[in-house]
Amino acid sequence: MTGVTYSFKSLVGVLTNSIVGVVVPLTGGNIGLGGITIRMTTARTAQDVAADGTVMPSYLAGANGELDIEVQETSILHKALLTLYNTLVLQADRADILGWAATSISFALLIDGSVHTLTGVSFEKIPDKPYQAAGQKITWKLLAASITSV
């Protein structure tokens, strides 16, 4: 049996915010991208245990989560995210919040066919900025109101 070779370069996607007119390509292996991690934050099951040990499972609705985008601190992608963040903060500080959670992200890994769509995306905060002898990677953390993965 032969395995399938993984390549981050087979990741293709896009980040868009139609309110502010931003389109940022997300392509693995390009533009200083170091990695992407998707994390669901809603537990889908809760269990209540009665005094006699009877377990009552409950299904919990929700599809929200987080997305970490790790980039080189001098990358084009970092600059694009920083520009979008600053634009949205400036608008929000002027009471224009229409664009704050209007970002959408979709990407696919061509090798295995997995597709992820995130909507209602907003920035958690500006990432920490390291200053060291050598350039570093920084991680942008975004929150998504809805994540679908196929």
For every predicted segment, state its role.
Residues 1-76, 113-141, 149:
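Solvent-exposed edge beta-strands and adjacent loop segments
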Residues 83-117:
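Short, acidic/charged, Gly/Pro-enriched secondary-structure junctions
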Residues 76-82:
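Short, conserved charged micro-motifs
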